[in-house]
Design a protein with these regions (language model features):
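Short beta-strand segments
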Residues: 75, 103, 136-138, 161, ...
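Short, Lys/Arg-enriched N-terminal segments with co-localized hydrophobic residues
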Residues: 3, 17, 21-29
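Short glycine-/acidic-enriched loop or helix-start segments at secondary-structure transitions
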Residues: 84-86, 145-147, 171, 209
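ATP/NTP phosphate-donor binding region
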Residues: 29-133
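Glycine-rich nucleotide phosphate-binding loop and flanking beta-alpha elements
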Residues: 81-82, 141-143, 206
């Protein structure tokens, strides 16, 4: 037992700690090790506001917005898919990127753990691993779900928000808040995850229902 204890002390002889460990050993019977993790993280990102930003997204990705990633998962809902997700998919394909569109039924009712799991399984089936980037194309439900998926998929992959609603532009797509709802709580299961960039395409507002404009 004594030899094993000495072996552990020698192996984990971090700077200046061995003597303190021996003192603690005498007091409590076993040494304690302290792990210090100090880092500075810059989560800054750009918000671009304009008209018809699909070409700009493609240009930014070509210039390394998502690093060396060339595989993009476009997450969207059934309403936004034909309007904006498919044109973006086509543009990225023209630029040589590998893209797939992952769709869920539009509406707040889809903001669930079940939808998140469905999206993750669909990405796995398509061969997506850690070397990918997620593009959220849609309103608040889309950006919430896509950002949450990005934060956990492969222990974290980059993502970009392409907001197509006023709510997403003003709140959901910025600030890094991502979450899903459950029968017991709203927006309580989630995480803070900052995007690489946010695009606010004002042209997308032309297709919004009037009730959303005035609300």
């Amino acid at each position: 037992m004594i030899k094993m204890q000495e072996h552990l002390e020698n192996r984990f002889d971090f700077t200046g700690q061995r003597q303190r460990e021996r003192q603690r050993e005498g007091e409590k019977g076993m040494p304690k090790l302290e792990v210090e993790l100090k880092r500075v993280v810059d989560d800054s990102y750009e918000i671009e506001i304009g008209h018809g930003l699909v070409d700009q997204v493609a240009a930014d990705l070509k210039h390394g917005l998502a690093g060396k990633v060339h595989k993009f998962a476009i997450i969207t809902d059934s309403n936004v898919e034909p309007l904006y997700a498919r044109p973006l998919e086509q543009k990225l394909a023209e630029e040589g990127f590998q893209t797939d569109v992952f769709i869920f039924p539009a509406g707040e009712k889809s903001k669930t753990r079940q939808t998140k799991a469905m999206l993750e399984d669909a990405m796995l089936e398509k061969g997506y691993r850690r070397d990918c980037c997620i593009l959220a194309v849609g309103g608040g439900v889309v950006t919430d779900l896509a950002g949450f998926v990005a934060g956990t998929y492969g222990r974290g992959v980059p993502f970009i928000n392409y907001a197509t609603s006023l709510l997403a532009a003003a709140d959901a797509s910025v600030g890094g808040k991502t979450a899903v709802d459950t029968p017991l709580a709203t927006n309580l299961i989630g995480l803070i995850n900052q995007p690489q960039k946010v695009y606010l395409d004002l042209d997308t507002w032309k297709t919004l229902p009037e009730r959303e404009i005035y609300s």
